[in-house]
């Protein structure tokens, strides 16, 4: 997801520079003082040009990849918060299964590490002031990081026929929504159970046959408790 990152809010300062100047004058500043204030406020902010608008569109990231690699299949960005990369994977697998495409790139990137982001996550008790300790009594939130990852996906039969170096096989992918719950950001055991159950049903695996599970691990009291109860219900019934 692009959305302009931190440059979006900074470029908006230039959009409102005329209003800032007028407010300063209305508050008693001279035109010269108002001009100096606006210049100082806008100093270092990106100028608005032909790349500003495209840079604020969420789809531009995938669009640039398609443009660079001359890819001619569907390209779009998915936004499902922490599950965005999984949502991209879900769509990619569906397109491959219905044979609308033969190869898909699915991935995600996150690099918006700035003060407002820290403040907002702290306000909901999700950002740890010290360190991340998921599923631990000391858990007090997670530590944010930056990174990116992308998968090249093909139907297994095609990959084997092409002699590709197959790293892993996706047997099933599942998704769900929490529906109505305690709050818009509150996790739901019902939704989690549905998503995981659908994935295992498609894979034709029983949850009890799986020996390694990668958890979300938000390191928050509510998030960890909900996820553990979900896994316990699936694995022990």
Where are these regions (language model features)?
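Condensing-enzyme catalytic core of the thiolase-fold
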Residues: 1-237
């Amino acid at each position: 997801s692009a959305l302009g990152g931190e440059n979006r809010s900074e470029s908006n300062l230039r959009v409102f520079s005329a209003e800032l100047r007028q407010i300063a004058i209305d508050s008693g500043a001279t035109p010269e003082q108002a001009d100096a204030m606006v210049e100082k406020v806008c100093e270092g902010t990106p100028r608005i040009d032909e790349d500003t608008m495209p840079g604020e569109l969420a789809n531009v990231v995938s669009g640039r990849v398609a443009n660079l690699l001359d890819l001619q299949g569907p390209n779009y960005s998915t936004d499902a918060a922490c599950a965005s990369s999984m949502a991209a994977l879900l769509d990619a697998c569906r397109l491959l299964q219905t044979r609308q495409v033969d190869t898909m790139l699915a991935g995600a990137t996150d690099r918006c590490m700035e003060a407002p982001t820290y403040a907002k996550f702290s306000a909901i008790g999700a950002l740890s002031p010290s360190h991340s300790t998921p599923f631990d009594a000391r858990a007090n939130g997670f530590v944010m990081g930056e990174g990116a990852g992308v998968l090249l996906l093909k139907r297994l039969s095609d990959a084997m026929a092409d002699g590709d170096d197959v790293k892993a096989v996706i047997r099933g992918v599942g998704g769900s929504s929490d529906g109505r719950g305690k709050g818009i950001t509150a996790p739901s055991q019902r939704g989690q159970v549905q998503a995981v159950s659908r994935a295992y049903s498609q894979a034709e695996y029983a949850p009890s046959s799986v020996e390694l599970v990668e958890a979300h691990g938000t390191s928050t009291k509510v998030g960890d408790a909900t996820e553990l109860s979900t896994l316990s219900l699936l694995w022990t019934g």
